[in-house]
Structure formats: C-alpha cells, structure tokens
C-alpha cells in the first residue's frame, strides 16, 4: 500500500480488509457459532465430529531429492524460455501510449495491428473486449516505448482502422505513460515484494525460534521465491504483459503459500517439543506434513476451484484482463500448495542437518 497507486493501492486496501475480516470470522465468529450449535443435544454427538484416524506416515523428507529436482527442472525450463523469448512488460512499466476505441461489428485484430505498425513503425499490441452488461465493444491499442504519438498520427490510425475494417470506430480515450513513471512503478513493485520477504523472515524467525529461527524463515522465503518464479514464467510462456496484475497475483500467492507453511512449521514445533529427542528431523517433518496434508489440499482445492471458475468465465466472455489475472493465479495457487508441502519442510530438514554436520566438525576440531 505504501508503494502502490491506482489499482494496486485499491488491491492493497481490499486485501488488507479481507485479511482482517477473515481473522475476525475465523477466530471469533466460527468459534461462537460452533459453541452455539453444540449446546443442542442433536448436534452434541460424536457422529457429527470426525474422529482422528491413524494415518500412514508419508516419507516427504526422504523424497526431497525428487522434489528439488522437479522444481529445478521447472525453473530451469522457465528460465531458458524467458531468456530465449523474453518477458513482455506492459506499458505501465515501460512507458508508452494507450489508445482506446469503441466500435460496432467485428474487428480484425491481426489486420489492425499490421496497419498501426506500418504507421508508427514499431511493434504494438491490440486487444478487444466486450462489456457483457451493456454490449459495448472496446479496442485497445498499446504502443510501448519512449516515443509519443502526434495528433496527426492518432488521426491517421483512426482513419485507417475505420477504412480497413468497415466499422465505426470512435476514440474513447488516449493516455500516455512517461518512461520514468513506468520505471518508478516497476521499482516500487520490486521493493514491495522484497520488503514482504524481509518481514516474513523476521516474523518467522521470532515465532519459530525453536526451529532454528533463521533457517525456518529463509526456507519459507525460498519456497515463496519458487512460487513467484513459476508465476513469472507463466506470464512469459503465455505472453501475458507483466503489469500490476503480476504484483497482485504475487502478493496473493505469498499470502496463501506462507499461511500453509506456517501451519506446517507450527505442527513441527509442537511435535518437537513433545517428542524432544525421540524423533529425527526427517521423522518430525514427515509426521507434521502428513497431519497437515489434508488441510492444505482442501484449502488449496477450494481456492483453485474458484480461480478456475473465474478463468473459464473470463475465457468464455472474452474478458482478457481477468484471464491474464486468473490463469497465473491458478497456476500459482497450485505451486504454492506444492511448495509448502514438498519444498519448505524437506528444505528445512536439509538446512538443519547440514548445520548440525558443520557444528560437529567444529566441535571435533576444537577437541583435537
């Protein structure tokens, strides 16, 4: 919120409000309603509550090599793809000109793109959308770069697309984004994400000092970076312009993913204090992950289902801006669930085991 403006500032306020309301509903309202229900004899029976069943302990820590290799392969593939094809930055971050038109009939976006590129002598992006409520059709032409458009060029573009497509286009809005404004927006977005990582490390280090503090914080952030890179590569592979939607998706994924990771760490801390030295680190993670697995999957499935419905509706009704948001969000949610289950815990085990080996070496050297 400090570094945001416009839609990002609105998203920040909405996200903060949702977190506060969710906290009140989850901590107070749900407890109040449950206590109210169990006062009745009909509901105060064992059959209404699921018994805790003995579960087979899954060996997540033993399979960490396979999880790490899978993630490395995905990230390496995405990196190579991005290096070869490049990322598509939106005008919001690069600067440029945005032309908006309303029209009737049909618009050939491929033909319009070629005609406009011939006029301005640079690459352009052409998108169409339709308001499902009013039926109004819109055409958006985006020109990235430092060069602006003269009034003569704007008039020529309007005349050309009207002649070539036999439609009645009318100029709705013309806006220019200065390059320094785009660079500032990109810088602020990066700062906001980096600061969120730092606060997460500090918070987890203080809350989970029993788990090594810094180790748990760093491994949690590594899992988050994994998710953000996956989302970034989705933007690149599907040629989605990187704009404030990327920042919104990133912050949303960070929230959901770190929540699952904290639940896992909390269970590890609980078992570690109860079992003391009876279990190894790998066994602690296996038991804790198995116990929180169903909760993580159920939560992720609910959110993924909502994101999938939004994605399908946006594709059917050709709401491109919503599609460009919901598709990366959908993949990011799946990645967040995977990283919190298969990356965060096993990575913490690897870190702690490696640290213990170093300490033993130092102790052995001192004795000599």
Where are these regions (language model features)?
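A structural signal for conserved, well-ordered secondary-structure elements
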Residues: 1-368
């Amino acid at each position: 919120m400090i570094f945001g403006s416009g839609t990002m500032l609105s998203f920040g306020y909405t996200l903060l409000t949702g977190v506060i309301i969710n906290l009140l509903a989850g901590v107070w309202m749900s407890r109040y309603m449950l206590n109210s229900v169990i006062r009745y004899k009909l509901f105060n029976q064992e059959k209404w509550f699921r018994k805790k069943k003995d579960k087979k302990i899954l060996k997540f820590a033993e399979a960490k090599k396979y999880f790490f290799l899978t993630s490395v392969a995905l990230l390496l593939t995405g990196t190579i793809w991005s290096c070869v094809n490049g990322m598509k930055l939106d005008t919001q971050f690069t600067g440029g000109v945005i032309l908006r038109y309303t029209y009737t009939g049909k618009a050939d976006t491929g033909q319009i793109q070629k005609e406009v590129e011939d006029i301005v002598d640079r690459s352009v992006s052409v998108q169409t959308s339709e308001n499902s409520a009013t039926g109004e059709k819109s055409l958006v032409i985006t020109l990235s770069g430092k060069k602006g458009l003269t009034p003569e060029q704007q008039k020529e573009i309007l005349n050309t697309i009207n002649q070539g497509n036999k439609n009645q286009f009318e100029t709705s809005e013309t806006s220019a984004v200065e390059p320094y404004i785009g660079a500032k927006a990109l810088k602020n977005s990066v700062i906001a994400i980096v600061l969120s990582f730092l606060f997460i490390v500090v918070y987890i280090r203080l809350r989970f000092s029993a788990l090594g503090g810094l180790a748990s914080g760093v491994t949690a952030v590594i899992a988050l970076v994994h998710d953000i890179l996956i989302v970034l590569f989705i933007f690149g592979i599907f040629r989605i312009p990187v704009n404030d939607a990327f920042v919104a998706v990133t912050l949303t994924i960070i929230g959901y993913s770190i929540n699952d990771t904290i639940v896992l760490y909390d269970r590890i801390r609980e078992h570690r204090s109860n079992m003391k030295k009876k279990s190894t680190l790998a066994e602690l993670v296996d038991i804790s992950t198995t116990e929180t697995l169903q909760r993580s999957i159920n939560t992720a499935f609910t959110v993924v289902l909502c994101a999938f419905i939004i994605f399908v509706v946006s594709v059917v009704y050709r709401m491109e801006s919503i599609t460009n948001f919901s598709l990366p969000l959908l993949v990011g949610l799946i990645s967040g669930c995977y990283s919190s289950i298969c990356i965060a815990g096993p990575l913490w085990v690897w870190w702690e085991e490696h640290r213990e080996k170093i300490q033993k070496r130092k102790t052995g050297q001192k004795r000599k």
